Amino acid sequence: GEEEDEEEEEEEESEEGGGEEEESEEEEEEKQENESHHQATSKEYIAVGDFTAQQAGDLTFKKREILLIIEKKPDGWWIAKNAKGNKGLIPRTYVEPYNKEEGQDTSEEEDSEEDVEVGDQTAGGEEVKQRTDSHWSAVQKAISEQINTVDVLTTMGAIPAGFRPSTLFQLLEEGNQFRASYFLQPELTPSQLAFRDLMWDAKTGTIRSRPSRVSFILTLWSCKMIPLPGTSIQVLSRHVRLCIFDGNKVLSNIHTVRATWQSKKPKTWTFSPQVTGILPCLLDGDCFIRSNSSSPDLGILFELGISYIRNSTGERGELSCGWVFLKLFDASGIPIPAKTYELFLNGGTPYEKGVEVDPSVSRRAYGSVFHQMMTMRRQPQLLVKLRSLNRRSRDLLSLLPETLIGSMCTIHLLIFYRQILGDVLLKDRTSMQSADLISNPVLATFPKLLEQPDMMDALRSSWAEKESTLKRSEKRDKEFLKAMFLLVYHDCVVPLLHSTLLPPFRWAEEETEAARWKVIADFLKQNQENGGALQALLSPDGVHEPFDISEQTYDLLGEIRKNVA
């Protein structure tokens, strides 16, 4: 398995590292013989920051000093020589290629050579095809703009060498094509005359269930040994972002689960904490995973991240603290077993290879098995559990879109949405060729809730309350339940979404989150006391945004997913 491979690699590395002192004299002679050869092959690099030796064998250097790289080790610590002829280990994140002609600016040729050096293999270990899709080049540009800040933080020692700007956050910022609200929409067939993943079942009087190649439940357990950033940055959120990935492309929405963190166990992150009332869906570690991609290299990409603010400048940012790719099928196409997986994290971005999250952990692992075991225990890791589905879960998941990742605690609400979509688009539409605007507030606004988890929680708690008052016979009546759901939605979500009292949703801003939750909680309490939203809607205190037709209108052609061949 992957873990064994990693252990073997570590053993090799540590054997190389073992007995350093005894070998040093022989090495010295060998290096003198090879000096001229190294001179020819090695490149000059310029330091982007000051570095002070952390232990014997490291090379101290100052910013803008020119260093000759003698050997590039895969653990991120390179052997370098300074102008005085002193040699030692340096962290690769502190240097960049030096171009004599242009001073510090590196030539394009050098850059591309560097890219090949770190990027010729993907998370799955396959060769990378040259990325041409425009969103990827935009992401690379955005990440390269952030790299300067991250370099500064790394140089200051504020973050470990393997941290990077978050790749998945950048994709989410690009537009809506990696958001759950996009994947929740139906997709047309290539002919554009029918829906590919939304069909009517006349026998049951609702939408037809659809199997998917990948359909299971995954539980995020915990993250261990995650290195801490320094005190110069304040962490606003710790989270895991996950998506379907084929080693090259993101093939689903990017789902985010926020971790719970306690200062008494600073290197451990946990999920699904015990809370009074309902567990917020943002903290729910139980996720459903659906994908119908036929790629043989299909898997889940996990990226651990932090949202931070720099104390000195007030600048905000998103960092990746490591990533791991779990392939879902073996070489012969058989799905991996449902069990708990202990996944060791990689540093860098998913398009780099051989970068450690924190190289200082394993760079001096000695040869003994005990040392290796200790080193393995100190490696950053993510624990996840793949669950096999019982019949009820399988039936529920098959009512969802073919490709979607989301929180298990919202699944019943997503199914209501899909069933209402089926009623409106398949059962009640006057003509299947009609693409007129449809008046339906639920269809028009529900996808927004997927980008505002606190609003989804408001709907969940209102629905749970309503459901608790229903008789058993009513709960079995699908049409009655749907009608009740529509009532709850109009009472709870519609007024809140357009209230001026509700500040816009902002990720990882504590004051905004608290202010929003107060408005939501007060409104739900009022509804409970008054038996509905009418009083709140008519109250002079409830100020609403000017009415916009989009609150009511479902634009079929505007909302459907574009068929990407």
Swiss-Prot record:
It comes from the Eukaryota. Residues 1-32, 104-118 have a biased composition (Acidic residues). The modification Phosphotyrosine is found at Y182, Y554. The modification Phosphoserine is found at S14. SUPFAM superfamilies: SH3-domain (SSF50044). Residues 1-46, 95-132 are annotated as: Disordered. Keywords: Cell junction, Cell projection, Cilium, Cilium biogenesis/degradation, Coiled coil, Cytoplasm, Cytoskeleton, Differentiation, Phosphoprotein, SH3 domain, Spermatogenesis, Tight junction. It is found in: Cell junction; Cell junction, Adherens junction; Cell projection, Cilium; Cytoplasm, Cytoskeleton, Cilium axoneme. Residues 40-100 form the SH3 domain. One of its GO terms (biological process) is cell differentiation. Residues 2-48 form a coiled coil. Expressed in renal cells (at protein level). SMART domains: SH3. InterPro entries: NPHP1, NPHP1_SH3, SH3-like_dom_sf, SH3_domain. The SH3 domain mediates the stable interaction with Cas. Belongs to the nephrocystin-1 family. Interacts with Crk-associated substrate BCAR1, NPHP4, PTK2B/PYK2 and tensin. Interacts with INVS and NPHP3. Interacts with AHI1 and TNK2. Interacts with NPHP4 in a complex containing NPHP1, NPHP4 and RPGRIP1L/NPHP8. Interacts with IQCB1; the interaction likely requires additional interactors. Interacts with KIF7. Interacts with ANKS3. Interacts with SPATA7. Interacts with FLNA. Together with BCAR1 it may play a role in the control of epithelial cell polarity. Involved in the organization of apical junctions in kidney cells together with NPHP4 and RPGRIP1L/NPHP8. Does not seem to be strictly required for ciliogenesis. Seems to help to recruit PTK2B/PYK2 to cell matrix adhesions, thereby initiating phosphorylation of PTK2B/PYK2 and PTK2B/PYK2-dependent signaling. May play a role in the regulation of intraflagellar transport (IFT) during cilia assembly. Required for normal retina development. This is Nephrocystin-1. The gene is NPHP1.
